[in-house]
Regions:
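C-terminal cap of thioredoxin/glutaredoxin-like
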Residues: 22-26, 101-214
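A short alpha-helix capping/helix-coil boundary motif
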Residues: 2-3, 89-93, 170-171
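Local sequence-structure signature of Cys/Sec-based thiol-disulfide redox active-site neighborhoods
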Residues: 1-25
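Charge-dense, low-complexity intrinsically disordered segments
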Residues: 10-13, 57, 61, 78, ...
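Residue-level signal for beta-strand positions within conserved beta-sheet cores that form or flank
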Residues: 1, 30-32, 166
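Structural alpha/beta surface segment adjacent to cysteine/selenocysteine redox centers
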Residues: 17-108, 112, 190, 194, ...
Length: 214
């Protein structure tokens, strides 16, 4: 069965996490299917030579990329179509809500092992964290996402109605706090209308408040 929405995520991005919680809330109310797909910030920045992109900073995107490798192993190894989404939820709850970024960077292997166990997933998937054979699929998903939106964006990228005549993709929405209930559905309807409107290219502002994970 085709998904109603493709959601391309990198697990270390706090903005993608907030958007994903909004999407999950709406899916529970509207009963639509999400396919959780990959976009790697580590790959997007692999040729980044800017001063601020230090080895210490690079450790964050690489942590996310390891999570995507494990996610790809889960995609291949599990019959449950919700398994990748459960994996993303486990990472996001710990990393963003639980503020475990420093612990994750300090010992990524142990940290990811604990998340696999907590999510009821095979601990053997941990071997994928440093397995470059998963990079081909992750890169293909990353390139697919950017082919739908253009290359000057990040994560999340959403595709409404993938594979249909009215398929539409965009970067975002970037929101500081995930709405719930009726407010979440109202935002969904507005965003879907904008995304699928012929000729719609961009709506944006750069002012943001700090992310709120509650």
């Amino acid at each position: 069965m085709a998904a109603d929405l493709d959601f391309f995520f990198d697990p270390v991005c706090p903005w993608a996490w907030i958007t994903s919680r909004w999407v999950v809330n709406v899916s529970e109310q509207r009963n639509y299917e999400i396919e959780w797909r990959f976009i790697s910030l580590w790959m997007l920045n692999e040729n980044n030579t800017r001063e601020w992109y230090t080895p210490q900073y690079r450790a964050g995107p690489y942590l996310g990329h390891q999570g995507l490798r494990i996610g790809d192993a889960i995609r291949l190894g599990e019959d449950d179509p919700t398994a990748v989404g459960r994996w993303y939820t486990a990472i996001g709850e710990a990393l963003h809500v639980g503020a475990q970024r420093e612990a994750a960077r300090g010992d990524a292997v142990s940290w990811y092992r604990g998340l696999l166990v907590g999510a009821g997933l095979d601990e053997g998937y941990l071997d994928a964290a440093d397995d470059e054979s998963h990079d081909e699929y992750i890169r293909a998903d990353t390139e697919l996402a950017l082919s739908r939106t253009g290359k000057d964006v990040g994560t999340p990228i959403l595709t409404f109605h993938p594979g249909s005549d009215n398929e539409a993709s965009f970067f975002g929405p970037v929101i500081s706090k995930a709405p719930r209930g009726a407010e979440a559905v109202e935002l969904w309807d507005a965003v879907e209308k904008l995304a699928t409107m012929s000729g719609m290219a961009e709506i944006k502002r750069s002012n943001r408040i700090a992310p709120d994970f509650t």
